[in-house]
Amino acid sequence: MFGLRNLRRGLSLCRFYSKPRPTPAPIKQDSQQSSQLPEWQKREKAHRKRYGNWNPTKRLSRAQMQDLRSLKQQMPHMKTIDFANLFKVSPEAIRRILQSKWTPTEEEEARLAARAQSAKNKSAQRRQQQIDNLKQAHSRMQPVTGIVEDARTSAIRPRNPRQRKPRQHQGQKTQQTQHDHDSHQPYVPSVGDVLE
């Protein structure tokens, strides 16, 4: 009755109205501008659209770069994004590493290893210097062995805290002969206080 043709048309209309569509005017202008651009700018634009801006937060070591290249040779079906998730770096960084064909010669490799070792030694020396400075600063400080007292207050305050008189609590009578409370316990009124 309705036919396959009408059913397909209805499905395509449903898909058309269910998805938001971008306005066609900027796309035409963009395509006209991109046709006038040189090839390298088109390629850069396509890379930016695909991967986003290149802002590397983590750098891979040379050994990791070599591992990445060998993995790509062993598994060419893996995509750049998969490698980016594996190494936890941006896909753009992975693309640049895989695109580069530079390999160091033996002399360059020795020079790079020496530079890395000297940087490591400088870092260790800097760390040791900081530790030595902290030890010197700690040794210059003299430990306080007793309570530092001010001459103005030492005459007023008794030296031994146990020789102090017990504090008078709220509701407590000033002359207390029958009830000697421990100075550490708060005063609690009892039946005997009411009877007196």
UniProtKB/Swiss-Prot annotation:
Transit peptide: 1-22
Keyword Electron transport: no
Organism of origin: Meyerozyma guilliermondii (strain ATCC 6260 / CBS 566 / DSM 6381 / JCM 1539 / NBRC 10279 / NRRL Y-324) (Yeast)
InterPro entries: NGRN/Rrg9
GO cellular component: mitochondrion; nucleus
Stated name of the protein: Required for respiratory growth protein 9, mitochondrial
Keywords: Mitochondrion, Transit peptide
Stretches the record annotates as Disordered: 19-48, 103-196
Biased composition (Basic residues): 159-170
Polar residues: compositionally biased ranges: 29-38, 118-133
Pfam families: Neugrin
